[in-house]
A protein has these predicted regions:
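Bacterial N-terminal signal peptides that target proteins for export
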Residues: 1-8
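Extracytoplasmic/secretory soluble proteins
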Residues: 8-568
Length: 568
């Protein structure tokens, strides 16, 4: 079922309409373990009387790589100054972060705190991570958020067969769609297309036709040749990790299928059919066939560069900034950098950039439906090394770092008075960077000579601030971004969240054994279909057979058996 979205723009409070309904269970805060040698509490700064060191993993993104200053004078030093906790950082390249933490967990050498985890399922059966749900009664900030925003139904979706969950997720008051598509509005207008009118009811098919017209215009003006592609996207190649990344995720959701980044943890594109009350594989459905035909049409007709699915993000961005392409993916963190890069290369006044509410397919659903996002695991090594009381102290520090308003603001904006302060705009008290600062991570641009607080000190990085209330998660939104979310509310809908089948450890292990090669096969075939290496009509049956040979039917059968058993 779908829920229509209406919009209230006061502080983007429209987003509260995304909140899912459910039971009224309350998180119980027992507080029956005395805090010896440290202070903690709901919106109380965690502080250890004696210096303490906790190890933590770090997903290091090349486009804002961790610098020594982050530890000596930036975010990590700020945390230590406030809490007396020194974070011993083990840094892994973001491209193979999951593989590296997997190796560390399996070898017993994992850090105590493991953030930036999207899918905890591969780590549960081995016993290398703690069932964190056993400790949430010691987490006052986490528990207060769960109670205030009725998060228990959402948390139920990540519980395992044993009734526990092993990842402390980022929790949103409301689901927010981050990734979308932006275009060179000036070129669309010159070609005779009003993108602001088109987006009100456009589809991927109609976008295809519009782009054919835009390319025809560009060829006539000598801006490109018939052999050139006018769309060469990012977050699909190296960062897409062989799945098609962001583009196939948002496009796939438009056709009620799982693809791209969404494929991770899906056991082969498994979705729930609410009419039949059973699970099926969307990856071998007619919807999937429709989706890849549409995606392929962009490549086949000379619009979308097949290098989209192999190139680095920098290459894709440079093609757009130099004017070789006129459409690409973006998100809130990238918008200001996109604007600044176009201004630097093309010159102010020589372009118009428009961030769209991306097209629909057979539905108008946004790709994001869950109020949960990536989160934090705690290793069994931490419990073994620290003992129960020491581990609970660690848990209370994590509660402050990831769930308190104070730490959220610090990790996102930096210290008040150093990088930002409050200002009053139209009678509203808002956060604003101080003169001389900008931040790509917040979508706040500036001069070339301004200091980017993410690059310099590590604020607004992707490792440590997740979720929170709508007011907090949108406190950096520019008027343009607020306008985008208003248009989402007008033109898009949100699908209900699928229920979860909760396998036992043995069942999970079996599903993983089947799912890994199956998903690799699905991803490989999908990219071959889209790039034209395989013919969708003549090779479709071979593709479906290959999925059956890799146990897609067994996965569906076992998933439905698990779900039937838990819903008796």
């Amino acid at each position: 079922m779908k829920k229509n979205l209406s919009v209230l723009i006061a502080g983007l409070c429209f987003a509260s309409l995304f909140v899912s309904c459910g039971g009224n269970k309350k998180a119980e805060v027992k507080g029956d373990v005395e805090a010896k040698g440290y202070t903690f509490g709901e919106e109380v700064t965690f502080h250890s009387d004696e210096p303490v060191t906790y190890s933590i993993s770090f997903s290091d993104a090349s486009w804002y790589a961790k610098q020594p200053e982050w530890e000596s004078e930036g975010i990590f030093k700020d945390i230590e100054n406030l809490t007396n906790v020194h974070l011993d950082i083990t840094s892994y390249d973001s491209g193979d972060y999951n593989q590296k933490i997997n190796l560390a967990i399996n070898s017993g050498s994992a850090t105590y705190i493991i953030p930036k985890v999207y899918d905890e399922n591969p780590y549960v059966a081995g016993g290398g991570v703690v069932a964190v749900s056993d400790y949430i009664q010691y987490m006052p900030n986490f528990s207060a958020f769960v109670e205030k925003y009725n998060m228990n139904p959402d948390l139920d979706t990540i519980r395992q067969n044993d009734g526990k969950f092993y990842r402390l997720p980022g929790m949103h008051q409301a689901a927010l769609q981050d990734y979308t598509i932006e275009v060179r509005e000036d070129i669309f207008e010159a070609a005779g297309y009003n993108i602001r009118e088109l987006e009100k009811d456009w589809t991927w098919e109609s976008l295809h036709d519009v782009l054919l017209g835009v390319k025809k215009y560009m060829v006539s003006q000598g801006m490109c040749t018939e052999k050139d592609y006018i769309w060469s996207d990012l977050w699909c190649g190296e960062s897409g990790k062989g799945t098609g990344g962001n583009l196939l995720k948002i496009m796939g959701a438009s056709y009620n299928v799982i693809s791209g980044w969404a494929m991770d943890g899906s056991n082969g594109g498994i979705k729930f059919d609410p009419a039949k009350k059973e699970f099926y594989s969307s990856s071998v459905s007619e919807d999937y066939k429709k989706f890849i035909k549409v995606a392929n049409s962009f490549v086949k007709n000379g619009i979308l560069d097949p290098e989209t699915f192999t190139q680095s993000d920098d290459v894709a961005n440079n093609k757009f900034y130099s004017g070789k392409t006129v459409i690409k993916s973006t998100n809130r963190s990238s918008m200001s950098n996109d604007e600044a890069s176009l201004a630097k290369i093309l010159g102010e006044g020589n372009y118009k950039l428009y961030v769209t509410a991306y097209p629909s397919g057979t539905n108008k659903n946004l790709a994001e439906t869950s109020r949960l996002e990536c989160g934090v695991m705690l290793s069994q090594k931490a419990l073994d090394d620290l003992g129960t009381e020491g581990f609970i102290k660690l848990v209370r520090f994590v509660d402050w770092m990831f769930y308190s308003k104070e730490a959220y603001t610090l990790c996102k904006w930096g210290p008040q008075g150093k990088t930002w302060d409050y200002t009053e705009v139209d009678g509203m008290k808002i956060k604003q960077l101080l003169p001389g600062f900008k931040c790509g991570g917040l979508g706040i641009g500036g001069k070339d000579t301004d200091t980017d607080i993410r690059l310099k000190w590590g604020y607004a990085g992707g490792n440590y601030f997740y979720g929170h209330s709508t007011a907090e998660s949108t406190d950096n939104f520019t008027p343009a971004v607020q306008d985008l979310y208003a248009r989402y509310g007008k033109y898009k809908t949100v699908a209900s969240v699928d229920p979860k089948a909760k396998p036992s450890e043995d069942q999970r292990e079996q599903l993983n054994l089947w799912a890994v090669p199956l998903q690799d096969n699905i991803n490989a075939w999908t990219l071959k279909f889209i790039t034209g290496q395989k013919n969708i009509d003549s090779d479709w049956d071979e593709y479906v057979s290959s999925c059956k040979n890799l146990n897609v039917e067994k996965i569906v059968k076992l998933t439905n058996e698990i779900y039937a058993a838990q819903t008796k």
